[in-house]
């Protein structure tokens, strides 16, 4: 009978234990390495996806949506086709072509109530709009889909920009520096027609520059960009986007700032003040003279 050496058995046991530990360590290393590789791979894939994925195009998706364009076409066929033609090509002696005017021009005209016109006249005047903002954007999308042109200004979340257009440095409050720059630009480019406070004025041939108070920020921006009716166009090469915003800041600041001298008399400056002095002041003096004469 063969005898077992205790030292040999002990050595064999240690060898097996050591081999098992090595095997476990290798297994642990493989597990850790696999987890790290998976983590690095997923992280790299995420970074790569972020890098190659374009920015959110919420606004573009809204404007290019086929259902929105179809809705706009239906509205166009009801209200616009008579004057602007079946294919937006315009109708002689009725309405101009809309090809290439862009959604900005449509928004200004329709949202301000100028279009559809109630009657043919020298100039379309502002009135209560016939269509809601959503319907207006649908018509604008249809026109933009057939010729392109200047677009509306949207926020990053896809909403239509309004107060965000109040100055190039707007952060919830109008920046006084924007108002100062906007005032200089307004007096240089706009005051000759709209008056230095934006209250409008008469032009030739029965036309006029409208009061700017009722216009919202998007309307003012699009008016500068598209040049409706008698107004010149101010492209981004003539007035940059920030300069347009600064002009809007000046207009809104002028409207919302109380007159330190009391009633502003329409904001027409020396004209209205002089008329008040002659029309009211002289009458008061005449009445006072007559009263003094009757007492003597």
Swiss-Prot record:
User: Which keywords annotate this record?
Assistant: Cell membrane, Electron transport, Heme, Iron, Membrane, Metal-binding, Repeat, Respiratory chain, Translocase, Transmembrane, Transmembrane helix, Transport
Q: What's the protein's topology in the membrane?
A: Multi-pass membrane protein
Which EC number(s) are documented for this chain?
7.1.1.8
Where is this chain's protein located in or outside the cell?
Cell membrane
Q: Which residues bind heme c 2?
A: 190, 193-194
Q: Which reaction does it catalyse?
A: a quinol + 2 Fe(III)-[cytochrome c](out) = a quinone + 2 Fe(II)-[cytochrome c](out) + 2 H(+)(out)
InterPro entries in the record: bc1_cytC-su, Cyt_c-like_dom, Cyt_c-like_dom_sf, Cytochrome_c_Oxidase_Subunit
Q: Which residue intervals make up region (Disordered)?
A: 1-27
The residues listed in the UniProt record as binding heme c 1, with positions renumbered to this chain, are 80, 83-84
Q: Give the multimer and partner information.
A: The cytochrome bc1 complex is composed of a cytochrome b (QcrB), the Rieske iron-sulfur protein (QcrA) and a diheme cytochrome c (QcrC) subunit. The bc1 complex forms a supercomplex with cytochrome c oxidase (cytochrome aa3).
What PANTHER family does the entry give?
A: CBB3-TYPE CYTOCHROME C OXIDASE SUBUNIT FIXP (PTHR33751), CYTOCHROME BC1 COMPLEX CYTOCHROME C SUBUNIT (PTHR33751:SF13)
Q: What does this protein do?
A: Cytochrome c1 subunit of the cytochrome bc1 complex, an essential component of the respiratory electron transport chain required for ATP synthesis. The bc1 complex catalyzes the oxidation of menaquinol and the reduction of cytochrome c in the respiratory chain. The bc1 complex operates through a Q-cycle mechanism that couples electron transfer to generation of the proton gradient that drives ATP synthesis.
This one is known as Cytochrome bc1 complex cytochrome c subunit
Q: What is the lineage of its organism?
A: Bacteria, Bacillati, Actinomycetota, Actinomycetes, Mycobacteriales
């Amino acid at each position: 009978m063969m005898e077992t050496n205790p030292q040999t058995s002990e050595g064999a046991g240690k060898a097996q234990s050591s081999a098992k530990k090595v095997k476990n360590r290798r297994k642990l290393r493989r597990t850790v390495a696999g987890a790290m590789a998976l983590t690095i791979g997923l992280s790299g894939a995420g970074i790569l996806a972020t890098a190659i994925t374009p920015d959110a195009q919420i606004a573009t998706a809204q404007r290019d949506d086929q259902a929105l364009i179809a809705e706009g076409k239906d509205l166009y066929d009801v209200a616009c086709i008579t004057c602007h033609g079946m294919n937006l090509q315009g109708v002689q002696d009725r309405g101009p072509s809309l090809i290439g005017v862009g959604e900005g021009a449509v928004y200004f005209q329709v949202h301000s109530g100028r279009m559809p016109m109630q009657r043919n006249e020298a100039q379309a005047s502002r009135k209560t709009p016939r269509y809601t903002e959503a319907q207006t954007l649908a018509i604008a999308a249809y026109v933009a889909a057939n010729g392109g042109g200047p677009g509306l200004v949207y926020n990053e979340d896809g909403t239509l920009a309004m107060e965000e257009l109040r100055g190039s440095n707007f952060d919830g409050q109008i920046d006084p520096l924007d108002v100062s720059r906007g005032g200089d630009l307004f007096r240089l480019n706009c005051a000759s027609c709209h008056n230095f406070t934006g209250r409008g004025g008469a032009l030739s041939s029965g036309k006029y520059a409208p009061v700017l108070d009722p216009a919202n920020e998007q309307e003012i921006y699009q008016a500068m960009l598209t040049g409706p009716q008698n107004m010149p166009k101010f492209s981004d090469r003539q007035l940059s986007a920030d300069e347009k915003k600064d002009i809007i800041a000046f207009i809104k600041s002028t409207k919302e700032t109380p007159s330190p001298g009391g009633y502003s008399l329409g904001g027409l400056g020396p004209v209205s003040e002089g008329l008040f002095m002659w029309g009211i002041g002289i009458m008061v003096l005449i009445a006072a003279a007559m009263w003094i004469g009757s007492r003597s």
